[in-house]
Amino acid sequence: MSRWGKNIVVPLDSLCKEKENTNRPTVARSVGTVGKWGKMGFTSTRTYTLPAIHPMAAAAAAAAAAASPSQSPASTQDHDPNDLSVSVPEPPKPKKFFKSRNTAPPEVIAQIIQQLPHCGAGASPMRDHFSSAGAGAGGLTPTSGAQEAGGVKLKPGKGASSAERKRKSPKKKAATTSASTPSTPGAFYGASDRDGDGLSDPASEQPEQPSSASGKQKQKKPKEEKKLKPEAPPSRVLGRARKAVNYREVDEDERYPTPTKDLIIPKAGRQPAEVAATATLAAASSEAFISSTFGSPGSEPSLPPPTSAPSASASTSSQLPSASGSASNPPSASRTPEHPPIVLRISKGTSRLVSTDSEEPPSSSPAHQNQLNQLSVTEEEPAERSGDETVPASTPKITVKPLRPPTAADSVDGSSAAVGGASAGDSFEERKSQSLEPNEDEEEEEEEEDEEEEPPEINYCTVKISPDKPPKERLKLIIKTDVIRNAIAKAAAAAESRSEKKSRSKKHKHKQLLAAGSGAAPASGATPAEINSEFKTPSPHLALSEANSQQAQHTPSHLHQLHQLHPQRGSAVISPTTRSDHDFDSQSSVLGSISSKGNSTPQLLAQAVQEDSCVIRSRGSSVITSDLETSQHSSLVAPPSDIESRLESMMMTIDGAGTGAASAVPETPLQEDILAVLRGEVPRLNGNTDPEPTEEEDQQQQPKRATRGRGRKANNNVDVTPPATETRTRGRAKGADATTAAISPPTGKRNTRGTRGSRKAEQEVDMEVDETAMTTVPANEEQLEQATLPPRRGRNAAARANNNNLASVNNNINKIAANLSAKAEASRLAEGGVAGGAARSYGRKRKNQQVTQVLQQEPVPEEQETPDAEEEQPTPAKIPHTDHREHSPDHDPDPDPDELSNNSNNSSLQHDGSSSSPPPRDFKFKDKFKRTLTLDTQGAANAGAGGAAAAAPPESSGEQRGAVKLVISKKKGSIFKSRALVPSDQAEQATVAKRHLYKHSWDAALEANGGGTNSDASNASASGVGVAGAKDHLHHLAAGKSDGDFGDSPSSNNNGSSSACSSASTLRGDSPALGKISRLAGKQGVPATSTSSDAFDLDLEPIAGELDLERSAAGASAGGTGATTGGGGATGGGGPVRVDRKTKDYYPVVRNVKTAHQIQEIGEYQEMDDDVEYILDALQPHNPPATRCLSALQLAAKCMMPAFRMHVRAHGVVTKFFKALSDANKDLSLGLCTSAIMYILSQEGLNMDLDRDSLELMINLLEADGVGGSTETGHPDRAGYDRNKQKVRELCEEIKAQGKGTHLNVDSLTVGTLAMETLLSLTSKRAGEWFKEDLRKLGGLEHIIKTISDFCRPVIACDTEIDWQPTLLDNMQTVARCLRVLENVTQHNETNQRYMLTSGQGKAVETLCQLYRLCSRQIMLHPSDGGGSNKEHPGVAMRELLVPVLKVLINLTHTFNEAQPSLGAELLGQRGDVVETSFRLLLLSANYIPDQCVFELSILVLTLLINLCMHTVPNRAALMQAAAPAEYVADNPPAQGSVSALQALLEYFYKCEELARLVEKNTDAFLESNEKGKKKQEEVEETVNNLVQRAGHHMEHTLKGSYAAILVGNLIADNELYESVVRRQLRGNSFKEIIGVLEKYHTFMNLTSSLEAAFVAHMKSTKRIIDNFKKRDYIYEHSDEHDNPLPLNLETTAQVLAVGADASHAATSSTTVGSGSAPSSTSATGTTRAPRVYKTYSSHR
């Protein structure tokens, strides 16, 4: 909870999982429903099936679900059995939103990390950790081993999910943790480790269970996370994928085979410890562990080593998703978790994924332990089954697993695993439970009994019905406390026998683990076969597989050794279960279910529980529950984004460098390291494998750790695990000796967490140490308080403290504070005394995690960090921690540093995803690399240094931490920079705590952490997340670290161990080098967890790079582990671990947080989208008219907003609206509303979203007024119509107020007027060329022509003077707008032109001609030369109407084919009034209209005349015979009797030419006068302006004269008679002046016109006319030769002109008609030229 309290902000990232998986690895997914862009479910807790989950993730989820049956204890007390089945398992679907998360990125990252030097450095440690995890978890199918083996990266994702679920269902966390633990080694570890913090402490927590059994207990008791109903998921894969992936956002690996996530095996390991406490939990834990181990491809192979029974079953469940576990797959099937991992949410804000990974929960869930027990048939099945799990994996079994009383074996194992099992026991025991389930069951049962003694109240008997196959119909009988208590009583007895058996089996496993560690390193990584084959590359997978195989083979000896090494691991694994049963209601539901593993629900149940657990809200974490859960669910739903995965990987790498190592372990190098370590060749692995080697490693690493404070972490683990004295032993030797299994494994584990390689060694060592450390950390915290407490009791107390903190985090911050205080005291004791080391285990865990991260990443920094951590924590805890941690770091740095660089990054990542699939690793590495090249670069450089030397890796780690920080902040796809800022630990915390993010229990965390310096922020963050997550994290670190979950999500192991681990691994591990080292740090992050608080301080203060990386790696580790350690370390680590509040700056960082504007955009988009859907539904025809009218008005009102208009246009919704309203014309009221919508939408100058149906509706609405004719009298809803009309009027007035639609008369609104306004606003440019055709076909043209005719009839028919009323003027304005539409649709459209010309037998043309004449008369009757533009003036209205009339007439007379004269020219030419009216306008209009209007009108009239005579000979004759207007004759009395139109035209030409010359002369004079005197700049500018204006006037006159000349040229074309008539009217009988004007015009056009076809044709036509004039002049001048040459020339010229001009000018003519009226009426020969010129001019115009 303290994590939550402090880093509660982090959950935002989780909430924003869409961007950054890392931050919401576990929590993020469930917290942030942001997986999808616009959807962020912060408040609602949703169960998300994980359809998009990677198959591996799905398998892990299924396994988790199967293992999750531990959740079946009816969600302990508070959760309904039904609650667990929140999510229905669905087949794993590729995560759509964040595909990168799902697949390649992790592999890429893994590859990148592999390649990075830091990878090299970290790979070894990671590998060692994997080996240790594999060896330690091998028997148990430790997640890390499984991940190593299976390349369980995908499953680790589930692990994260499980961790998240744990968070979600803190109460179920215990039970769920068992379930969760199995789900994904990493995930389960993450879940279990978080549980481990909360659940891993189940042993101690169980005693505490009444108070709050675990950190989760807080949540668990108040509100046991509702156990997800064991809804039979289609497959374990589905459930696991579903929940695991989402929750395990950190676990990109789920989506992507990212080893880091799966590396969270320690969860599983821890769960075996739990299984000790609860056979069911242990079995589920083992199964889950196996499942988690094998949940991911890599993970499963790990299980096969323990393939005997648990491994196979866990592997199977895990394999279901990934089919990676070869041997395990069958068991997996049998225990296929059917529900996603259950996230137990701690009420304080820390939620644990009890079965975070539905896939992996089996490992820790009863199902998993059942599986393990069932699967123990293979190897440990007899032993494990001998516990509570008697049901064979193959046959459905109903196992009632009562909590087991601690047995001698358990206590034996518990001595090492109880001390370690108390703190590390959780995670280690869980893990051991998986690896050494018999022993661990005993240990766990001892722990559990100790814990049970306290919380017997929640003794849930999980009746786990495990069919031979993991049937989806798994029955999960959850017996509430009464039954469970009885079951617990039975479990006590059964636990003794089972614990003995499990002790055997765990010892067997442990031996196997040891064998795997020493000789089975290759096997540990994968199923024995897979591992062995993989072992060719000394891959941790091989190590795990070998370890598992050896565990299977050497169950007695190796199991014993492993039990010694991993007894804590197993105990821890079981311990969480045990504690879960009692301590965690939530966990009890899940882990309690697992605790009552004896009869724990089968994997199926566990799976179902886990799936449901997604929805489960931890009782205590109501605050976070809804939002965070929703986010979690959302996380489940949306796979973590690539960036998130990378961030997670990076964070895990940084935070869980060990995690990364574990993930990387799958790589051969890691396996080699692991093998070496397991064999004792590599101290790290040896630490895990052999108690002495562990001690050696511890001692070897101890100096480093001591210097770096990693030892502290180890010490914390060791302290708890062994006597404080041993724990205090700086070297792991003491801790390993005293608690070889307990202390050494925790150390290894912590180291593992610190670094992946280290994590490997620590997987074995830390497995034990984590169990021990987890047990010990809690025990340390409590043992520190009660130095003399039995390890388990200390663990129980510590677990209580941790679990209470976990549970209390959910349930009570006070509990957290108490637990933290207890842990702090324990830490102090460990620091100061025998238990001091143990207590330190917690406090150190964080520091050591950081230190370990740094250590393994950079041995020197680690040493430095270790001293810091040691300084923070007393030397005793510090030293043992350091020893253990350093032991792992020695292994990690020495063998694994290079491999870490190469493999730890790659391999650890790969291990996460799949031991057998480096590509998953590559994805992770890719993600890491993608997330931050900076981190990669730093990590690579650091890793290079670190890889070079053992010390170098720690340095690299330190550097990488800085880089990691950057990585986190600079997540590649991350929208939220803040995520990157969160340290890996915190990232994990954030991921875990994200659910509780909003609870921000700083104070509670601080109280709990009391003396935790770094623990303040880290503890608050890590206390909320750390107390709940601390134990869980310690356990998770132990289990996860040991199993590789640490490596996966050091931080995730804490909070959503797999989630945070994935987060760390993804975040930190994302950076290939950095990620690995970070992951190693994450593994070492177990100690680094304790160091993490320190590391946070260190990060905050000591080194920017180290600070970043350390904060990132250790931060993730410390944040997650450190959060755990902060919570646990604060509790256990006490004062030294406390983080200053200033560190809070880092903790509140929320990852995946959207910026304000993004939230706003998403909200606005969603709001508009919802509005559209709502309105669209209400507009459908099946609704009543009143409803449709109301919705239409609502839509119209919304369309007033530009943003909404843009939205509906952008998404093409407009046509959907009109389609729904297609029958609106049948109802007057609805039609009015519809036309209002159209009108409003048309007021923008944007293209209309029209289709044929919408246009048809618009045209139907034009005539809708008739339908409503009865409106006045008998409209059925007159009142409604009036109401709607008023609303429409208000909208229209608002539009007019905006300056639009000024011509609309709002007082006379009708359906037709609005529709017409809409139609008239359309143009082909806006609506498209199709508009011209459809408008004609749909009757729009006909309606427009009819409207014009109707409006003009009263005016045209009036013989007397017209009384222009406002209504008539309004009608004329409407006619003008209709004519503009006609002009638009007839331009360059011959079909529409012919339609208009033939419409109504020529009535349209007749109406136009009458209107033309009317305008001409009215202009002269009502002069408007005042320049005013008052539209109420009849002259102004008619003048404005005349322009569109002329343009329509010009279009109608345009000739498309010169060979075929224009039909319009013929029809209009037959009406004499057209030519007469045209000459009147041309010659007289200048006297009645403003000067600025004369030019346009003159050009249009000349263009019309040119079109009439260009190709139509009859029209030429009409023009030649036409007489000038009488008014013109009166003004210009003729010398002779009459004046012809031709004479008037020529005079007009000379007048224009003279005016042009005059203007030109004035301009020249003006220029000369200006040149005489010097002008100021202002005067020069004024002169230029004047010249421009004068030049404009000059060209206006020139253009008018030119058009007149073109008209003359067309008249005389091919007609000598007309030529002679014209020549007589010319000055000097010569065309020279005409030629001069035309040449000037031609030059002007040539310079200014574009190269469009119309202009080019016009230019050619003009040139022909000029040439014709010249020839005619030449012929005339040579009159003597006139007879012969002239006809020839004329003929030739005419032919040439005709051919060229007819062809090109025909097109030009009609084109020009629109612009000008010059060339149209030239005579025959000239006609060809003139028309073109005219056309061109017209077009040019």
Curated annotation (Swiss-Prot):
Ranges of biased composition (kind: Polar residues): 367-377, 586-604
Chain intervals with Acidic residues compositional bias: 438-456, 860-873
Alphabetic keyword roster: Chromosome partition, Meiosis, Phosphoprotein
Gene inactivation effect: Flies exhibit brain cell metaphases where sister chromatids of all chromosomes are aligned parallel to each other instead of assuming the typical morphology, heterochromatin condensation or chromosome segregation are not affected.
InterPro entries: ARM-like (IPR011989), ARM-type_fold (IPR016024), WAPL (IPR039874), WAPL_C (IPR022771), WAPL_dom (IPR012502)
Keyword Cytoplasm recorded: no
Keyword Cytoplasm: no
Gene Ontology BP term (one): chromatin organization
PTM sites of type Phosphoserine: S355, S888
Biased composition (Basic residues): 165-174, 503-512
Low complexity biased stretches: 175-185, 309-334, 408-426, 515-529, 553-568, 796-810, 849-859, 939-952, 1047-1065, 1708-1730
Molecular function in Gene Ontology: cohesin unloader activity
One GO CC annotation: nucleus
Residue ranges, compositional bias (Basic and acidic residues): 880-894
Gene3D superfamilies assigned: Leucine-rich Repeat Variant
Highest taxon listed in the record's lineage: Eukaryota
Residue numbers of Phosphothreonine PTMs: T258
Compositional bias per record (Gly residues), positions renumbered to this chain: 1117-1136
Span list, region Disordered: 68-100, 119-277, 291-472, 490-612, 675-810, 823-963, 1038-1068, 1112-1141, 1708-1741
PROSITE patterns (UniProt xref): WAPL (PS51271)
Record-annotated WAPL domain positions: 1140-1648
Stated family: Belongs to the WAPL family.
Job description of the protein: Has a role in female meiotic chromosome segregation in females; proximal heterochromatin is involved in chromosome pairing during female meiosis. Is a dominant suppressor of both white and Stubble position-effect variegation (PEV), while it is a weak enhancer of brown variegation.
Protein name as it appears in the record: Protein wings apart-like
